Amino acid sequence: MFGQTFPYQDPSLSPAERAADLCSRMTIEEKAQVMLDRSKAVTRLGVPEFAWWSEALHGVGRNGYSTVFPSCIGMAASFDDALLERVFTAVSDEARAKNTAQRRTGSVGKYQGLSFWTPNINIFRDPRWGRGQETYGEDPYMNARMGLAVVRGLQGPADHKYAKLYACAKHFAVHSGPEKMRHSFNIDDLSPRDLWETYLPAFKALVQKGGVKEVMCAYQRFENDPCCGSNRLLQQILRDEWGFEGIVVTDCGAIGDFWKPGRHGVSDDATAASAKAVASGADVECGSDYANLPDAVSKGLISEDQIDVSVRRLLAGRFHLGDFDPDSLVEWTSIPESVIACKEHKDLALQMAQSSIVLLQNRNNVLPLSKTNDTGNIMVMGPNAADSVMLWGIYFGKPTHSVTVLEGIENKVGAVAYDKACDITSMTVTETSTGKSTEAADGSTTLELSVNSERTNTIADILAAAADYGTIIFVGGISPNLEKEEAKVQAPGFDNGDRTSIELPQVQRDLLKALHDAGKTVILVNCSGSAVGLVPETETCDAILQVWYPGEQGGNAVADVLFGDYNPCGKLPVTFYKDDSQLPPFDDYDMSNRTYRYFKGEPLYPFGYGLSYTTFSVGEPVYDVSAGNITVSVTNTGNFNGAEVVQVYIRRPSDTDGPAKALRQFARVELQAGETKTVEIPLTRDNFEWWDPTTSTMRVQEGEYDIMVGTSSDDNDLKTISVTL
């Protein structure tokens, strides 16, 4: 068959059998080369080059044209994992089509492979973390459930011979900033409860329920060992306890952090660092230090047999992806290039952007606006109104066309008055055009912008420009150029990609107050990848929409909501705190007073919150212990068709040290005006897993539990029943 000479060339054998045979024929130098993220070809054995590092955070990234979906935190706000799976099925279609075309040229470069380093299922424990927008929020169950949808969409059906792609759960583990400390930071005092109850459950779910094929180890140290050299994390927990059989990849440059000056300082040099990482279970390095593995073997720091364990794993993965086999055998290679940025995918991007929008405030039902009356009375303002780059978030692809919020509004109602008014943090307004983006070795991206014009406004200038308009749609917030991965950016409220304050930038706050004081109807469209402190804006703005970084179709989605063609149904996947005073120290990983589960104060907007143009009523829940489900009626009591998200939380009253409540299920329900549906939501015994201090494990314990069912995490929005297991 196909002129095979060796067993590894036989597609009828299992990936593990083929990998073992191929590994046995490789030299130690060849083995070291295939353990790098840019795996070079081994020509004498017919092993093609392979790129382990590709990106698909919310669309195929850094690899030419693709469909750009909303940021992950925005997609989490949809509370719709079925829709999310459709999104990532589209993403994997585009990724496979791109890879097939590239392979046929004879060369597969960086970002063009079949291994995609997503999803990010770290817990967004603090709104100041610049990379929180990559996650699915602050709740472990939400990250697990949405992460499972991502894995299903990317990897394809588990029972097929060949995987569609490989997904990667990252960053393992206990990783969420600060960005500027990640290469030297040590977390050595975390309680077992926080580790197992908060930071690990999503990873466990993706390994044991999702069959995720890759896990990425994080930069920082955990209990004095770098995560990529942690025997406890990578061997004892991940492989021994959870049964993970896949590939561990390192974050980019993480092995260098073992030995470079001013970082972790746990290894003398790259050779020793590489030996430590491989011995701990890190199979593929994003970087170049693993080229020193032959030297490590010669010095007795690691055996070739230990290296073979990793090589067999990664080769088995490549065989499973069909990397060695003819396209005629691999079903996924038939996906045509025409799927890339196709109309169906753009429609899906619009649907997800619509579903992600959260209506935070709607005083006197000012929204939706009329499309036919008084549109000449509307003025659009703000630093994000005409900014296409804002739409893309971070780790983005290149859309064939982006619709800014201004364009979306004009698509809906025709030309409207517009003034940028200010930049994100300054009254000096720069009008820019997008230049090129460049990626550093560690994966950080620099977007170079060319400045076309610059002017400095005063509030008086803006009020004069707005004098003839009664309704101001102010598209503000912050920017993915300021909150992102390890950004070398300094601006008021921002530091190296993280935020130093959650408050809306002062220049925007002052403008909104001035517009309000001038008698304008003010609608704030807040664009951000994280929670923003908006206490003054609840007074100065008549309506507030949280639209995140909404992707290439974001402008159309925002316009659909503003003008009533789509009834908002998004819910917050994070707590919106009132101000900075409610936040613990950023570098403290203790969960005390963090997130809705442990926060003791009164938030501005709670986790799970989101308004609608209609109203809903949730009936009394009934729990059937034997069947393992909750039954509850939901009625649309208003005049608009819409969707409500029924949320199910549990708590253990006897556990006074535990969370106030914990999300364990949710269901999105579509209802016509006046319609009632009875919703059945599974709530099985496994959903009652709870921390047991006597065994230091998460397990289902006998006793009393409260089941809380409603429309947000706020007690006032929940109905409670007690059950005994």
Feature annotation, model-predicted:
Residues 1-691, 697-715, 724-725:
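Glycoside hydrolase catalytic-domain context in secreted enzymes
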Residues 719:
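A conserved ligand/cofactor-binding region detector
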